[in-house]
């Protein structure tokens, strides 16, 4: 066997780029935007343009790949191919402007929900569009087999390369004491998945489709995987779900909501297994495959009925959400698929094409996933507040008013006491709906209910470097409604870090050294010299209590902070010498060297410590 040369690999890479230029350009852009987001996630005031650019470019990888494959399969002219590529580019630009831009909500997860729908649609289109009019389903199967195998091998190679590079970096760190930022590992992973994996995938797609279509040997490993792994698992899951259905009938209990997700997962697993075994359906030695393929869809119908029953109960109680809408949509698709094959139709291309059509129809318009789910939860919230008389004439009857001249500090006007006429159940429902709307749609629709512009207040907090980053949109709106989760005023977090570069801890005079990290709810146990030492915060969270049996010592951390005048500093994140962050007990049995302090400054200027980390030194010798 002739070994691959560097020149051969270079030529293959160049050939792949020339064949799929827009695919690689999209991959390079997606990786560039993604690495920018990783690098500047904490410092950028608005990542939405870069997140949206990353997602749209990622969509372009599959979209342009599908366009080029479609053009090659249909033998379109260069001009027709350019027209399709221009249409694809226009679609991507249109999608970019439909993604959330940060105006209605600062939740950077929002664009990913729409991206997931479009991404699934584009991949499904790639799977069937080149063979949309072909009557040869085996050609369609062979084509998707090539895509599946190439994807699997590409991911495996990418994983091996990533692990190899990470091990190399770890070796450099251990042998040469060179430090690497944590972000570099994620950036390397993004580069490998985005650039190498994409390039490797497209380089293995034959230009001659006859080479794919005339393939009459099927991978033995794929058959073994489907027959001896997927099908036994599928049978087990079906037995579990049917056992649950029998339990429902015997106890006459309504099904739990989670069963909907299980049914969707099991149904999809079964359809995947049948697709992988499709070429063997007429094999005389494997007659059971044909029998199982026919009866599988009969077995699915009762489970689909349970799915609709379970999700219907959840919708009647809690309204429609994105997830519930998708479950209903997938339930409709499963019902259609079951009846299609039960009635004797055999074209497996209907599976991806029908799902793509449903997803595309549900991705836009007033009937779409996002509009219906937002309106459903908005109407639920409006109904709860109206019934409790908290909302009247589209205005909240009470709300906390904020001092705009104190922004980005969030400080309420004095002497405001809210008494919302909501019981505990209603309060929890309101909190849940506000969180959902904030995370998935934004809170624009409820802005008119308030007398103050909460959107501008939120922007003032987020865009100012001194703003409290822990305040998100849902928390601001709930606090304004008098429904703050903690029922405490907002407090700014301060951090003190020790400069540990080339620092060594002085241990003379002490017998034991132990590192520790202490949170508000924690108590830490340290064993030294056969004795037990318990560390915890004092009740007022101003210091640390060290207990050894009946012996107890308290060390004041608040006074240490005051002594170093850290509270007067304008910086929220302060770095000082570790020599200023040491404190001893009076009898010098204990010494704390603090490396990290997180605390809040209450309205009365008192310090309240949230977390500590550092080193505890213990001297067990008796002091005279």
What are these regions (language model features)?
Residues 1-76:
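N-terminal signal-anchor module of multipass membrane proteins
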Residues 26-45, 62-72, 84-107, 121-130, ...:
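Hydrophobic alpha-helical transmembrane segments and adjacent interfacial helices
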Residues 36-55, 75-78, 100-116, 174-188, ...:
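Membrane-helix interface and helix-disruption motif detector
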Residues 71-85, 97-226:
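Membrane-interface helix-loop-helix junctions at boundaries between adjacent transmembrane segments
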Residues 164, 291-344:
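Membrane-embedded alpha-helical segments of integral membrane proteins
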Residues 347-370:
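Internal/C-terminal transmembrane anchor helices
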Residues 363-386, 390:
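Hydrophobic alpha-helical transmembrane segments in integral membrane proteins
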Residues 392-624:
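Extracytosolic and intramembrane catalytic regions of membrane-associated proteins
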């Amino acid at each position: 066997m002739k070994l691959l040369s560097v020149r051969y690999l270079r030529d293959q890479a160049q050939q792949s780029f020339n064949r799929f230029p827009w695919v690689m350009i999209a991959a390079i852009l997606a990786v560039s935007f993604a690495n920018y987001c990783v690098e500047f996630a904490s410092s950028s005031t608005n990542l939405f343009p870069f997140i949206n650019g990353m997602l749209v470019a990622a969509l372009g990888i599959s979209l342009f790949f599908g366009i080029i494959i479609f053009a090659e399969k249909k033998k379109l002219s260069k001009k027709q191919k350019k027209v399709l590529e221009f249409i694809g580019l226009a679609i991507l630009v249109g999608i970019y402007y439909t993604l959330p831009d940060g105006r209605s909500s600062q939740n950077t997860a929002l664009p990913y929900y729409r991206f997931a729908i479009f991404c699934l649609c584009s991949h499904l289109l790639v799977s069937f569009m080149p063979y949309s009019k072909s009557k040869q389903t085996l050609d369609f199967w062979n084509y998707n087999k090539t895509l599946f195998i190439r994807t699997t091998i590409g991911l495996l190679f990418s994983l091996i390369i990533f692990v190899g590079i990470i091990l190399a970096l770890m070796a450099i760190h251990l042998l040469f004491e060179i430090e690497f930022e944590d972000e570099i590992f994620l950036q390397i992973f993004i580069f490998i998945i985005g650039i190498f994996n994409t390039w490797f995938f497209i380089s293995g797609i034959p230009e001659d489709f006859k080479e794919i279509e005339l393939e009459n040997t099927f991978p033995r490993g794929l058959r073994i995987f489907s027959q001896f792994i997927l099908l036994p698992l599928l049978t087990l899951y079906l037995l579990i779900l049917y056992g649950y259905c029998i339990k429902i009938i015997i106890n006459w209990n309504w099904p739990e909501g989670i069963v909907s997700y299980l049914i969707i997962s099991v149904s999809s697993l079964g359809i995947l297994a049948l697709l992988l075994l499709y070429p063997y359906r007429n094999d005389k030695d494997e007659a059971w495959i044909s029998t199982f393929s026919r009866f599988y869809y009969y077995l699915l119908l009762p489970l689909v009925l349970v799915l609709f029953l379970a999700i219907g109960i959840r919708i009647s109680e809690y309204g429609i959400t994105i997830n519930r809408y998708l479950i209903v949509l997938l339930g409709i698709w499963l019902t259609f698929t079951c009846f299609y094959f039960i009635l004797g139709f055999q074209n497996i291309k209907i599976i991806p094409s029908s799902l793509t059509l449903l997803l595309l129809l549900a991705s836009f318009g007033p009937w779409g996933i996002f509009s219906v789910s937002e309106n459903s939860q908005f109407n639920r919230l409006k109904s709860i507040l109206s019934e409790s008389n908290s909302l009247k004439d589209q205005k909240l009857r009470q709300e906390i008013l904020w001092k705009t001249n104190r922004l980005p500090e969030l400080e309420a006007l004095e002497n405001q006491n809210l008494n919302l006429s909501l019981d505990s159940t209603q309060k929890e429902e309101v909190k849940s709906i506000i969180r959902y709307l904030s995370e998935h749609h934004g809170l624009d629709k409820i802005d008119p209910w308030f007398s103050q512009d909460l959107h501008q207040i939120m922007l003032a907090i987020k865009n100012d470097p001194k703003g409290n980053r822990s305040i998100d949109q849902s928390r601001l709106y709930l606090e304004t409604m008098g429904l703050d989760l903690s029922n405490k005023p907002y407090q700014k977090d301060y951090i003190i870090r020790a400069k540990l570069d080339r620092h060594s801890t002085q241990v003379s005079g002490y017998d034991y050294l132990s590192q520790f990290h202490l949170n508000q709810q924690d108590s830490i146990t340290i064993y030294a010299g056969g004795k037990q030492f318990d560390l915890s915060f004092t009740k007022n969270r101003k210091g640390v209590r060290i207990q050894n049996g009946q012996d107890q010592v308290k060390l004041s951390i608040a006074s240490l902070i005051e002594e170093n005048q850290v509270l007067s500093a304008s910086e929220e994140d302060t770095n000082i010498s570790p020599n200023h962050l040491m404190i001893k007990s009076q009898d010098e049995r204990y010494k704390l060297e603090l490396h990290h302090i997180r605390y809040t400054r209450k309205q009365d200027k008192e310090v309240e410590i949230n977390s500590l980390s550092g080193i505890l030194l213990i001297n067990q010798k008796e002091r005279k």
